[in-house]
UniProtKB/Swiss-Prot annotation:
Reactions mediated catalytically: O-phospho-L-tyrosyl-[protein] + H2O = L-tyrosyl-[protein] + phosphate
Family label: Belongs to the low molecular weight phosphotyrosine protein phosphatase family.
Protein name from the UniProt record: Low molecular weight protein-tyrosine-phosphatase
Protein source organism: Streptomyces coelicolor (strain ATCC BAA-471 / A3(2) / M145)
Keyword Transmembrane: no
Keyword Hydrolase: yes
Function: Acts on tyrosine phosphorylated proteins, low-MW aryl phosphates and natural and synthetic acyl phosphates. May be involved in the regulation of sulfur amino acid metabolism.
GO function term, MF aspect, one: protein tyrosine phosphatase activity
Pfam assignment, any one: LMWPc
Catalytic residues (UniProt): 9 (nucleophile), 15, 128 (proton donor)
Domain of life: Bacteria
Length: 164
């Protein structure tokens, strides 16, 4: 049974596609590609059908990550097929939990940086790099990479628990 993760930011052109690309690479490197699917979406549909921001694509490519992406808006009906919904900041977390049709679905929503032990008790938001320069995208990637290690460990535990 496939474990499904969806990363969510505002417009699905910067942070969430970056998190999706990094996490997919981690999943493949861990040999879990046949068991875990990663996807992304935005809380809004302003960029629906567009590719990722060119700065996101450039930073990912410079760090060896691939990305084939078309932006889309998160839909309430997706909760039923997802195991984990990963929000990139507290605003997304609140919006997604409000959208969740059940308490069980709301419990599926977590902040990405909550998986990074280095920020325990600190600011768990991944800042939106959209209005800044390349440095903001590099910083975003660093945060995503740091949290992806803990996220992979948590997902691996869930996947192995299902197999037991």
């Amino acid at each position: 049974m496939t474990y499904r993760v969806c990363f969510v930011c505002t417009g699905n052109i910067c942070r969430s596609p970056m998190a999706e690309a990094v996490f997919r690479a981690r999943v493949e490197d861990a040999g879990l590609g046949h068991l875990v699917e990663a996807d992304s979406a935005g809380t809004g549909g302003w960029h629906e059908g567009e590719g990722a921001d060119p700065r996101t694509e450039a930073v990912l490519a410079d760090h060896g990550y691939g990305l084939d992406h078309a932006a889309r808006q998160f839909q309430q009906s997706w909760f039923s097929r997802l195991d984990l919904v990963v929000a990139l900041d507290a605003g997304h977390l609140r919006a997604l939990r409000r959208l969740a049709p059940t308490e069980r679905d709301a419990a599926k929503v977590r902040l990405l940086r909550s998986y990074d032990p280095a920020v325990a008790g600190g600011d768990l938001d991944v800042p939106d790099p959209y209005y800044g320069g390349r440095d903001g995208f590099e910083e975003c990637l660093e945060m995503v990479e740091a949290a992806s290690t803990g996220l992979l460990a948590a997902v691996r535990e869930q996947v192995e628990g299902r197999a037991a």
